Protein backbone atom coordinates (compact mmCIF):
# COMPACT_ATOMS: atom_id res chain seq x y z
CA UNK A 1 0.00 0.00 0.00
CA UNK A 2 1.35 3.41 -1.00
CA UNK A 3 1.40 5.83 1.93
CA UNK A 4 2.85 8.68 -0.15
CA UNK A 5 2.24 9.21 -3.86
CA UNK A 6 3.85 11.87 -6.04
CA UNK A 7 2.54 12.12 -9.62
CA UNK A 8 4.00 14.04 -12.57
CA UNK A 9 5.60 16.77 -10.47
CA UNK A 10 7.59 19.45 -12.29
CA UNK A 11 9.37 22.36 -10.69
CA UNK A 12 12.01 24.92 -11.61
CA UNK A 13 13.63 28.16 -10.62
CA UNK A 14 13.60 30.63 -13.51
CA UNK A 15 14.86 28.88 -16.64
CA UNK A 16 16.44 26.06 -14.64
CA UNK A 17 14.47 22.80 -14.42
CA UNK A 18 14.89 21.03 -11.08
CA UNK A 19 12.30 18.26 -11.50
CA UNK A 20 10.43 17.28 -14.64
CA UNK A 21 7.42 14.94 -14.65
CA UNK A 22 8.72 13.22 -11.50
CA UNK A 23 6.72 10.39 -9.93
CA UNK A 24 7.40 8.67 -6.62
CA UNK A 25 5.70 6.19 -4.33
CA UNK A 26 6.52 5.19 -0.78
CA UNK A 27 5.20 1.87 0.47
CA UNK A 28 4.59 0.98 4.11
CA UNK A 29 7.88 0.01 5.79
CA UNK A 30 10.07 0.98 2.81
CA UNK A 31 13.50 2.44 3.54
CA UNK A 32 14.28 4.86 0.71
CA UNK A 33 17.57 6.55 -0.10
CA UNK A 34 17.23 9.75 -2.16
CA UNK A 35 20.52 10.29 -4.01
CA UNK A 36 22.02 12.63 -6.59
CA UNK A 37 24.79 15.17 -7.02
CA UNK A 38 24.76 18.52 -5.17
CA UNK A 39 22.16 20.86 -6.64
CA UNK A 40 20.20 18.16 -8.47
CA UNK A 41 17.02 18.81 -6.47
CA UNK A 42 16.98 16.47 -3.46
CA UNK A 43 16.17 19.25 -0.97
CA UNK A 44 13.63 20.72 -3.42
CA UNK A 45 11.89 17.34 -3.59
CA UNK A 46 11.78 17.08 0.22
CA UNK A 47 10.37 20.62 0.45
CA UNK A 48 7.66 19.70 -2.07
CA UNK A 49 6.53 16.52 -0.30
CA UNK A 50 6.51 18.24 3.11
CA UNK A 51 4.41 21.12 1.77
CA UNK A 52 7.06 23.81 2.17
CA UNK A 53 7.13 24.36 -1.58
CA UNK A 54 4.30 24.18 -4.11
CA UNK A 55 5.30 22.40 -7.33
CA UNK A 56 4.71 24.12 -10.67
CA UNK A 57 2.82 21.03 -11.86
CA UNK A 58 1.69 17.65 -10.50
CA UNK A 59 0.27 16.45 -7.21
CA UNK A 60 1.42 15.06 -3.86
CA UNK A 61 -0.98 12.78 -1.99
CA UNK A 62 -0.47 11.46 1.55
CA UNK A 63 -2.45 8.53 2.93
CA UNK A 64 -4.97 9.53 5.63
CA UNK A 65 -3.91 9.49 9.29
CA UNK A 66 -0.20 9.29 8.47
CA UNK A 67 2.22 10.84 10.95
CA UNK A 68 5.42 12.30 9.53
CA UNK A 69 8.62 13.62 11.05
CA UNK A 70 11.11 15.80 9.19
CA UNK A 71 14.62 16.53 10.44
CA UNK A 72 14.75 20.28 9.82
CA UNK A 73 18.03 21.69 11.14
CA UNK A 74 16.54 25.21 11.21
CA UNK A 75 13.98 24.28 13.89
CA UNK A 76 14.23 26.59 16.89
CA UNK A 77 15.05 25.18 20.33
CA UNK A 78 13.81 27.44 23.13
CA UNK A 79 16.67 28.68 25.38
CA UNK A 80 15.95 28.14 29.06
CA UNK A 81 14.83 24.55 28.50
CA UNK A 82 17.03 21.58 29.32
CA UNK A 83 17.76 18.88 26.74
CA UNK A 84 15.49 16.52 28.70
CA UNK A 85 12.61 19.02 28.60
CA UNK A 86 13.08 19.53 24.85
CA UNK A 87 13.01 15.75 24.29
CA UNK A 88 9.91 15.31 26.44
CA UNK A 89 8.10 17.56 23.93
CA UNK A 90 8.17 14.54 21.57
CA UNK A 91 5.44 13.07 23.80
CA UNK A 92 3.40 16.26 24.23
CA UNK A 93 0.18 14.53 23.22
CA UNK A 94 0.63 12.09 26.14
CA UNK A 95 1.25 14.90 28.61
CA UNK A 96 -1.95 16.49 27.29
CA UNK A 97 -3.79 13.23 28.04
CA UNK A 98 -2.30 13.14 31.55
CA UNK A 99 -3.54 16.71 32.08
CA UNK A 100 -6.97 15.58 30.92
CA UNK A 101 -6.97 12.88 33.64
CA UNK A 102 -6.06 15.44 36.31
CA UNK A 103 -8.82 17.77 35.09
CA UNK A 104 -11.34 14.90 35.25
CA UNK A 105 -10.32 14.15 38.86
CA UNK A 106 -10.76 17.84 39.75
CA UNK A 107 -14.24 17.94 38.20
CA UNK A 108 -15.37 14.83 40.08
CA UNK A 109 -15.78 16.86 43.28
CA UNK A 110 -18.31 19.16 41.60
CA UNK A 111 -20.53 16.74 39.66
CA UNK A 112 -23.46 14.50 40.70
CA UNK A 113 -22.56 10.94 41.69
CA UNK A 114 -24.43 9.66 38.61
CA UNK A 115 -21.77 11.21 36.32
CA UNK A 116 -18.73 9.97 38.25
CA UNK A 117 -18.88 6.42 36.82
CA UNK A 118 -18.75 7.76 33.25
CA UNK A 119 -15.83 10.03 34.15
CA UNK A 120 -13.97 7.12 35.79
CA UNK A 121 -14.43 5.13 32.57
CA UNK A 122 -12.89 8.04 30.64
CA UNK A 123 -9.96 8.07 33.08
CA UNK A 124 -9.50 4.31 32.60
CA UNK A 125 -9.56 4.63 28.79
CA UNK A 126 -6.95 7.39 28.86
CA UNK A 127 -4.74 5.44 31.28
CA UNK A 128 -4.89 2.42 28.96
CA UNK A 129 -3.70 4.60 26.07
CA UNK A 130 -0.88 6.01 28.20
CA UNK A 131 0.22 2.56 29.40
CA UNK A 132 0.05 1.10 25.87
CA UNK A 133 2.32 3.90 24.61
CA UNK A 134 4.84 3.55 27.45
CA UNK A 135 4.05 6.86 29.14
CA UNK A 136 5.15 5.65 32.55
CA UNK A 137 8.62 4.63 31.28
CA UNK A 138 9.17 7.71 29.11
CA UNK A 139 12.35 8.83 30.85
CA UNK A 140 14.07 5.49 30.27
CA UNK A 141 13.00 5.66 26.58
CA UNK A 142 14.39 9.19 26.34
CA UNK A 143 17.67 8.19 27.96
CA UNK A 144 18.10 5.14 25.70
CA UNK A 145 17.86 7.16 22.46
CA UNK A 146 19.67 10.19 23.91
CA UNK A 147 22.61 8.03 25.02
CA UNK A 148 22.68 6.29 21.64
CA UNK A 149 23.23 9.64 19.92
CA UNK A 150 25.65 10.99 22.53
CA UNK A 151 23.41 13.45 24.38
CA UNK A 152 24.09 11.69 27.66
CA UNK A 153 27.75 12.76 27.32
CA UNK A 154 26.62 16.40 27.13
CA UNK A 155 24.18 16.02 30.05
CA UNK A 156 20.40 15.98 29.72
CA UNK A 157 20.07 18.86 32.20
CA UNK A 158 22.14 21.14 29.92
CA UNK A 159 20.33 24.27 28.66
CA UNK A 160 19.67 23.93 24.91
CA UNK A 161 20.69 27.59 24.53
CA UNK A 162 24.29 26.60 25.33
CA UNK A 163 24.57 23.91 22.64
CA UNK A 164 26.80 23.98 19.56
CA UNK A 165 25.27 23.54 16.09
CA UNK A 166 26.19 19.84 16.08
CA UNK A 167 24.76 19.24 19.55
CA UNK A 168 21.56 21.09 18.59
CA UNK A 169 21.20 18.84 15.52
CA UNK A 170 21.56 15.79 17.78
CA UNK A 171 18.71 17.03 20.01
CA UNK A 172 16.45 17.53 16.97
CA UNK A 173 17.28 14.06 15.61
CA UNK A 174 16.74 12.40 19.01
CA UNK A 175 13.39 14.16 19.42
CA UNK A 176 12.32 13.02 15.96
CA UNK A 177 13.24 9.37 16.63
CA UNK A 178 11.33 9.46 19.93
CA UNK A 179 8.21 10.64 18.07
CA UNK A 180 8.39 7.39 16.03
CA UNK A 181 6.40 8.74 13.04
CA UNK A 182 4.99 6.47 10.31
CA UNK A 183 7.21 8.30 7.80
CA UNK A 184 10.60 9.62 8.87
CA UNK A 185 12.31 12.16 6.57
CA UNK A 186 16.03 12.62 7.26
CA UNK A 187 18.25 15.09 5.41
CA UNK A 188 21.96 14.35 6.08
CA UNK A 189 21.45 13.03 9.64
CA UNK A 190 25.08 11.85 10.04
CA UNK A 191 26.69 15.25 9.41
CA UNK A 192 27.02 16.04 13.11
CA UNK A 193 27.49 12.51 14.42
CA UNK A 194 30.77 10.80 15.24
CA UNK A 195 31.56 7.19 14.31
CA UNK A 196 30.01 5.50 17.39
CA UNK A 197 26.76 7.42 17.12
CA UNK A 198 26.55 6.84 13.34
CA UNK A 199 26.77 3.10 14.05
CA UNK A 200 24.02 3.41 16.68
CA UNK A 201 21.76 5.29 14.22
CA UNK A 202 22.57 2.74 11.50
CA UNK A 203 21.39 -0.14 13.72
CA UNK A 204 18.32 1.85 14.79
CA UNK A 205 17.25 2.54 11.18
CA UNK A 206 17.92 -1.04 10.07
CA UNK A 207 15.38 -2.19 12.66
CA UNK A 208 12.96 0.73 12.08
CA UNK A 209 9.61 -0.88 11.25
CA UNK A 210 8.09 2.25 9.70
CA UNK A 211 9.03 3.93 6.42
CA UNK A 212 11.72 6.54 5.95
CA UNK A 213 13.22 8.74 3.24
CA UNK A 214 16.92 9.41 3.73
CA UNK A 215 19.25 11.87 2.01
CA UNK A 216 22.89 11.06 2.73
CA UNK A 217 26.27 11.22 0.98
CA UNK A 218 27.68 8.73 3.52
CA UNK A 219 27.66 5.70 1.23
CA UNK A 220 28.57 2.96 3.78
CA UNK A 221 25.76 4.26 6.03
CA UNK A 222 23.28 4.47 3.14
CA UNK A 223 24.18 0.98 1.92
CA UNK A 224 23.37 -0.59 5.27
CA UNK A 225 19.95 0.97 5.91
CA UNK A 226 18.03 1.39 2.61
CA UNK A 227 16.25 -1.10 0.36
CA UNK A 228 15.10 1.32 -2.37
CA UNK A 229 16.98 4.12 -4.15
CA UNK A 230 15.46 7.12 -5.92
CA UNK A 231 18.06 8.86 -8.07
CA UNK A 232 17.59 12.43 -9.31
CA UNK A 233 19.68 13.54 -12.29
CA UNK A 234 19.03 16.09 -15.04
CA UNK A 235 15.58 16.77 -13.49
CA UNK A 236 14.57 13.08 -13.86
CA UNK A 237 13.67 10.95 -10.82
CA UNK A 238 14.25 7.19 -11.24
CA UNK A 239 13.44 4.31 -8.87
CA UNK A 240 15.81 1.36 -8.28
CA UNK A 241 15.30 -1.65 -6.00
CA UNK A 242 18.12 -2.49 -3.59
CA UNK A 243 20.81 -0.54 -1.75
CA UNK A 244 23.30 2.02 -3.12
CA UNK A 245 25.76 -0.55 -4.51
CA UNK A 246 22.97 -2.33 -6.38
CA UNK A 247 21.70 1.02 -7.68
CA UNK A 248 25.20 1.88 -8.96
CA UNK A 249 25.46 -1.43 -10.81
CA UNK A 250 22.06 -0.97 -12.49
CA UNK A 251 22.66 2.74 -13.16
CA UNK A 252 26.02 2.14 -14.87
CA UNK A 253 24.54 -0.73 -16.91
CA UNK A 254 21.61 1.46 -18.00
CA UNK A 255 23.99 4.28 -18.93
CA UNK A 256 26.14 1.89 -20.96
CA UNK A 257 23.09 0.46 -22.78
CA UNK A 258 21.75 3.94 -23.55
CA UNK A 259 25.15 5.01 -24.89
CA UNK A 260 25.38 1.92 -27.11
CA UNK A 261 21.84 2.50 -28.42
CA UNK A 262 22.67 6.19 -29.02
CA UNK A 263 25.84 5.36 -30.99
CA UNK A 264 24.02 2.72 -33.05
CA UNK A 265 21.20 5.15 -33.86
CA UNK A 266 23.65 7.93 -34.78
CA UNK A 267 25.30 5.62 -37.33
CA UNK A 268 21.89 4.77 -38.78
CA UNK A 269 20.95 8.48 -38.96
CA UNK A 270 24.24 9.24 -40.69
CA UNK A 271 23.57 6.53 -43.31
CA UNK A 272 20.01 7.73 -43.90
CA UNK A 273 21.06 11.38 -44.24
CA UNK A 274 23.87 10.40 -46.62
CA UNK A 275 21.47 8.35 -48.78
CA UNK A 276 18.88 11.18 -48.83
CA UNK A 277 21.51 13.80 -49.78
CA UNK A 278 22.84 11.63 -52.65
CA UNK A 279 19.51 10.50 -54.06
CA UNK A 280 16.83 13.16 -53.50
CA UNK A 281 17.71 15.12 -56.67
CA UNK A 282 17.74 12.09 -59.03
CA UNK A 283 14.41 11.21 -60.64
CA UNK A 284 15.16 7.49 -60.52
CA UNK A 285 15.85 7.45 -56.76
CA UNK A 286 13.80 10.39 -55.42
CA UNK A 287 11.00 8.12 -54.11
CA UNK A 288 13.52 6.00 -52.19
CA UNK A 289 15.02 9.19 -50.73
CA UNK A 290 11.55 10.34 -49.65
CA UNK A 291 10.92 6.96 -48.03
CA UNK A 292 14.18 7.24 -46.07
CA UNK A 293 13.24 10.80 -45.04
CA UNK A 294 9.89 9.56 -43.67
CA UNK A 295 11.72 6.87 -41.71
CA UNK A 296 14.10 9.51 -40.33
CA UNK A 297 11.24 11.86 -39.40
CA UNK A 298 9.43 9.09 -37.47
CA UNK A 299 12.54 8.00 -35.60
CA UNK A 300 12.43 8.55 -31.83
CA UNK A 301 15.77 10.20 -31.18
CA UNK A 302 17.80 8.78 -28.30
CA UNK A 303 19.44 11.54 -26.28
CA UNK A 304 23.14 11.26 -25.56
CA UNK A 305 23.92 10.50 -21.92
CA UNK A 306 24.81 13.79 -20.25
CA UNK A 307 27.95 13.48 -18.18
CA UNK A 308 27.93 15.62 -15.06
CA UNK A 309 30.77 18.08 -14.77
CA UNK A 310 32.92 16.83 -11.91
CA UNK A 311 34.69 19.31 -9.62
CA UNK A 312 38.44 19.79 -9.73
CA UNK A 313 40.11 20.97 -6.52
CA UNK A 314 43.71 22.13 -6.28
CA UNK A 315 45.20 24.12 -3.41
CA UNK A 316 47.87 26.72 -4.14
CA UNK A 317 51.00 26.19 -2.10
CA UNK A 318 52.83 29.04 -0.36
CA UNK A 319 56.49 28.94 0.70
CA UNK A 320 57.31 26.28 3.30
CA UNK A 321 56.77 27.04 6.98
CA UNK A 322 59.34 26.45 9.71
CA UNK A 323 59.73 23.00 11.26
CA UNK A 324 56.92 23.49 13.80
CA UNK A 325 53.63 24.89 12.51
CA UNK A 326 52.51 25.28 16.12
CA UNK A 327 53.49 24.22 19.61
CA UNK A 328 51.30 24.52 22.70
CA UNK A 329 52.49 25.09 26.25
CA UNK A 330 50.10 23.89 28.99
CA UNK A 331 47.18 24.81 26.72
CA UNK A 332 43.65 24.40 28.04
CA UNK A 333 40.71 25.12 25.73
CA UNK A 334 37.20 26.10 26.79
CA UNK A 335 34.74 28.93 27.33
CA UNK A 336 33.14 29.30 30.79
CA UNK A 337 34.77 26.03 31.86
CA UNK A 338 37.70 23.93 30.68
CA UNK A 339 37.05 21.36 27.95
CA UNK A 340 40.47 19.69 28.22
CA UNK A 341 43.32 19.07 30.58
CA UNK A 342 46.66 20.73 29.78
CA UNK A 343 47.82 20.07 26.22
CA UNK A 344 51.46 20.10 25.17
CA UNK A 345 51.14 19.18 21.52
CA UNK A 346 52.84 20.20 18.30
CA UNK A 347 52.31 19.94 14.57
CA UNK A 348 55.32 19.63 12.27
CA UNK A 349 55.63 20.87 8.70
CA UNK A 350 54.17 18.34 6.23
CA UNK A 351 52.15 16.44 8.82
CA UNK A 352 48.54 15.62 7.94
CA UNK A 353 46.56 15.05 11.12
CA UNK A 354 42.90 14.05 11.54
CA UNK A 355 41.11 14.92 14.79
CA UNK A 356 38.31 12.62 15.90
CA UNK A 357 36.13 12.17 18.98
CA UNK A 358 32.54 12.56 20.09
CA UNK A 359 30.80 15.90 19.63
CA UNK A 360 30.98 18.59 22.27
CA UNK A 361 34.52 17.80 23.43
CA UNK A 362 36.15 20.77 21.73
CA UNK A 363 37.35 19.75 18.25
CA UNK A 364 36.14 22.99 16.63
CA UNK A 365 37.17 24.98 19.72
CA UNK A 366 40.71 23.59 19.42
CA UNK A 367 40.97 24.75 15.79
CA UNK A 368 39.68 28.23 16.68
CA UNK A 369 42.08 28.46 19.63
CA UNK A 370 45.07 27.46 17.51
CA UNK A 371 44.10 30.11 14.93
CA UNK A 372 43.64 32.84 17.57
CA UNK A 373 39.90 33.19 16.91
CA UNK A 374 39.16 31.93 20.44
CA UNK A 375 41.34 32.81 23.44
CA UNK A 376 42.91 29.90 25.35
CA UNK A 377 41.20 29.06 28.64
CA UNK A 378 44.76 28.72 29.97
CA UNK A 379 48.27 28.29 28.58
CA UNK A 380 49.50 29.44 25.19
CA UNK A 381 49.85 28.61 21.50
CA UNK A 382 53.09 29.38 19.67
CA UNK A 383 52.68 29.70 15.90
CA UNK A 384 55.43 29.69 13.27
CA UNK A 385 56.34 33.08 11.79
CA UNK A 386 55.90 31.89 8.20
CA UNK A 387 52.39 30.52 8.22
CA UNK A 388 49.90 31.05 5.41
CA UNK A 389 46.76 29.39 6.72
CA UNK A 390 43.50 28.48 5.02
CA UNK A 391 40.53 27.79 7.30
CA UNK A 392 37.33 25.97 6.30
CA UNK A 393 34.72 26.58 9.00
CA UNK A 394 32.11 23.92 9.72
CA UNK A 395 29.10 26.23 9.78
CA UNK A 396 28.63 28.99 7.23
CA UNK A 397 26.60 32.17 7.63
CA UNK A 398 22.95 31.20 7.19
CA UNK A 399 21.49 34.42 5.79
CA UNK A 400 24.23 35.41 3.34
CA UNK A 401 22.60 37.38 0.50
CA UNK A 402 25.78 37.55 -1.62
CA UNK A 403 25.72 35.63 -4.87
CA UNK A 404 28.37 32.92 -5.18
CA UNK A 405 30.14 35.19 -7.69
CA UNK A 406 30.20 38.17 -5.29
CA UNK A 407 31.20 35.96 -2.34
CA UNK A 408 34.45 35.08 -4.13
CA UNK A 409 34.94 38.41 -5.91
CA UNK A 410 34.67 40.39 -2.64
CA UNK A 411 37.66 38.44 -1.32
CA UNK A 412 39.61 38.60 -4.59
CA UNK A 413 38.68 41.94 -6.24
CA UNK A 414 41.76 41.83 -8.48
CA UNK A 415 40.31 38.95 -10.48
CA UNK A 416 38.16 39.50 -13.56
CA UNK A 417 34.54 38.36 -13.76
CA UNK A 418 35.54 35.59 -16.16
CA UNK A 419 38.34 34.37 -13.87
CA UNK A 420 36.03 34.13 -10.85
CA UNK A 421 33.36 32.33 -12.90
CA UNK A 422 35.97 29.94 -14.29
CA UNK A 423 37.27 29.04 -10.84
CA UNK A 424 33.76 28.46 -9.50
CA UNK A 425 32.97 26.30 -12.55
CA UNK A 426 36.06 24.17 -11.79
CA UNK A 427 34.52 23.48 -8.39
CA UNK A 428 31.48 21.93 -10.11
CA UNK A 429 29.15 24.95 -10.01
CA UNK A 430 26.89 25.86 -12.93
CA UNK A 431 26.00 29.36 -14.19
CA UNK A 432 22.74 29.16 -12.19
CA UNK A 433 24.67 28.35 -9.00
CA UNK A 434 27.21 31.11 -9.63
CA UNK A 435 24.52 33.79 -9.90
CA UNK A 436 22.42 32.47 -6.98
CA UNK A 437 22.53 33.88 -3.45
CA UNK A 438 24.57 31.86 -0.96
CA UNK A 439 21.53 31.39 1.30
CA UNK A 440 19.52 29.61 -1.42
CA UNK A 441 22.31 27.24 -2.46
CA UNK A 442 22.25 23.68 -1.17
CA UNK A 443 24.70 22.72 1.58
CA UNK A 444 26.99 21.05 -0.95
CA UNK A 445 26.98 24.00 -3.36
CA UNK A 446 27.69 26.36 -0.46
CA UNK A 447 30.65 24.21 0.61
CA UNK A 448 32.04 24.26 -2.95
CA UNK A 449 31.97 28.08 -2.99
CA UNK A 450 33.89 28.18 0.29
CA UNK A 451 36.39 25.62 -1.01
CA UNK A 452 36.79 27.78 -4.12
CA UNK A 453 37.85 30.71 -1.92
CA UNK A 454 40.44 28.51 -0.23
CA UNK A 455 41.80 27.37 -3.60
CA UNK A 456 42.58 30.96 -4.60
CA UNK A 457 44.74 31.56 -1.54
CA UNK A 458 48.45 30.70 -1.21
CA UNK A 459 48.58 28.39 1.82
CA UNK A 460 51.03 26.13 3.60
CA UNK A 461 48.61 25.06 6.36
CA UNK A 462 45.01 23.92 5.78
CA UNK A 463 42.65 23.80 8.77
CA UNK A 464 39.46 22.01 7.76
CA UNK A 465 36.46 21.56 10.06
CA UNK A 466 34.15 18.84 8.69
CA UNK A 467 34.68 19.77 5.01
CA UNK A 468 32.88 16.64 3.76
CA UNK A 469 29.52 17.61 5.29
CA UNK A 470 27.00 18.02 2.43
CA UNK A 471 29.49 17.16 -0.35
CA UNK A 472 28.31 14.60 -2.91
CA UNK A 473 30.34 11.47 -3.69
CA UNK A 474 32.28 12.94 -6.64
CA UNK A 475 33.18 16.13 -4.75
CA UNK A 476 34.25 14.14 -1.70
CA UNK A 477 36.49 11.87 -3.78
CA UNK A 478 38.04 14.87 -5.53
CA UNK A 479 38.67 16.69 -2.24
CA UNK A 480 40.35 13.58 -0.88
CA UNK A 481 42.61 13.44 -3.95
CA UNK A 482 43.50 17.15 -3.66
CA UNK A 483 44.37 16.84 0.04
CA UNK A 484 46.55 13.80 -0.64
CA UNK A 485 48.39 15.80 -3.30
CA UNK A 486 48.80 18.95 -1.17
CA UNK A 487 52.44 19.27 -0.03
CA UNK A 488 51.72 21.50 2.99
CA UNK A 489 50.42 20.73 6.48
CA UNK A 490 46.82 19.72 7.24
CA UNK A 491 44.75 19.68 10.42
CA UNK A 492 41.40 18.04 9.70
CA UNK A 493 38.28 17.46 11.79
CA UNK A 494 36.18 14.73 10.18
CA UNK A 495 33.64 12.12 11.30
CA UNK A 496 34.26 9.85 8.28
CA UNK A 497 37.32 7.59 8.82
CA UNK A 498 37.01 6.23 5.27
CA UNK A 499 37.69 9.76 3.98
CA UNK A 500 41.05 10.22 5.72
CA UNK A 501 42.41 6.85 6.89
CA UNK A 502 44.58 6.16 3.84
CA UNK A 503 46.37 9.54 3.64
CA UNK A 504 46.77 11.16 7.09
CA UNK A 505 50.02 10.69 9.00
CA UNK A 506 48.42 10.68 12.46
CA UNK A 507 45.03 10.68 14.21
CA UNK A 508 44.38 12.67 17.41
CA UNK A 509 41.46 11.59 19.60
CA UNK A 510 40.07 14.42 21.75
CA UNK A 511 38.52 11.82 24.04
CA UNK A 512 42.04 11.30 25.43
CA UNK A 513 42.25 14.99 26.41
CA UNK A 514 38.77 15.83 27.65
CA UNK A 515 37.84 16.69 31.21
CA UNK A 516 34.39 15.19 30.59
CA UNK A 517 33.37 11.58 31.20
CA UNK A 518 33.12 9.81 27.84
Show which residues each predicted segment covers:
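Intracellular alpha-helical coupling/juxtamembrane segments of multi-pass membrane proteins
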Residues: 250-305
Amino acid sequence: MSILTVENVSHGFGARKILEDASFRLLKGEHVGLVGANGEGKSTFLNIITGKLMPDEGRVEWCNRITTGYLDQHTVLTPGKTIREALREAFQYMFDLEREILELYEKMGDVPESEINAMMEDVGDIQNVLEHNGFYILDSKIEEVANGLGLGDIGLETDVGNLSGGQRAKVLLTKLLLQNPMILILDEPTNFLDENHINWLKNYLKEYENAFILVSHDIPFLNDVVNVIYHVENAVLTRYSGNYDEFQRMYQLSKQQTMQAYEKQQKEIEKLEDFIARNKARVATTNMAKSRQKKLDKMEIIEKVKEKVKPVFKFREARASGRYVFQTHNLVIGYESALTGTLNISLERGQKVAIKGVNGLGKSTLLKTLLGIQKPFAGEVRLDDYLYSGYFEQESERYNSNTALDEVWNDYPGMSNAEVRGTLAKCGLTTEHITSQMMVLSGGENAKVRLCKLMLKDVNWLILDEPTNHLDVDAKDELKRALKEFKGTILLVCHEPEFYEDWVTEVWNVENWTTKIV
